[in-house]
Amino acid sequence: MYLVDTNVWLELLLEQERAMEVQQFLQSAETIQLSMTEFALYSIGLITTRLGKEEIFETFISDILEDSAVKRICLTSFDLKRMLTVRKKFHLDFDDAYQYVAAKRDNLILALRYSVWVVE
């Protein structure tokens, strides 16, 4: 099972350079195997609306949250505190540490923009 990072979704939604690779990855996995964090969802909302692409975010909500089996993950307060420790230990920025802790907690493979990361 995969935790799909914000940048992977954005690559496809904003039709960036590697959008076809992302599309192939998403099509190769059943939606029941895919997860995303609340943080990723809100980040996608922030970015798309700042770019004036609200319709892309609205379609994303319909496709990913309402019409598919993609699981949405939210960290607890304990997880958030753990995230701060992980961030310092591995010198990660906030969003990467958030994704790392979510993947570790739920035993997911973290699908990043240009690689797949097995969190142990």
What are these language model-derived features?
Residues 21, 43-44, 82, 119-120:
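Phosphate- and divalent-cation-binding pockets in alpha/beta enzyme and binding domains
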Residues 43-73, 78-80:
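Active-site-proximal, substrate-binding regions of enzyme catalytic domains
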Residues 1-36, 50-62:
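Short, well-structured N-terminal submotif of metal-dependent ribonuclease cores
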Residues 28-32, 67, 106:
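Structured helix-beta-strand junction loops
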Residues 37-43:
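Short, conserved active-site loops that position catalytic residues or coordinate cofactors/metal ions
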Residues 5, 35-37, 92-93, 114-115:
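Histidine- and aromatic-rich ligand-binding microenvironments
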Residues 70-113:
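Active-site neighborhoods of divalent-metal-dependent phosphate/nucleic-acid chemistry enzymes
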Residues 9-10, 41, 117-118:
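A generic structural signal for short hydrophobic patches within well-formed alpha-helices
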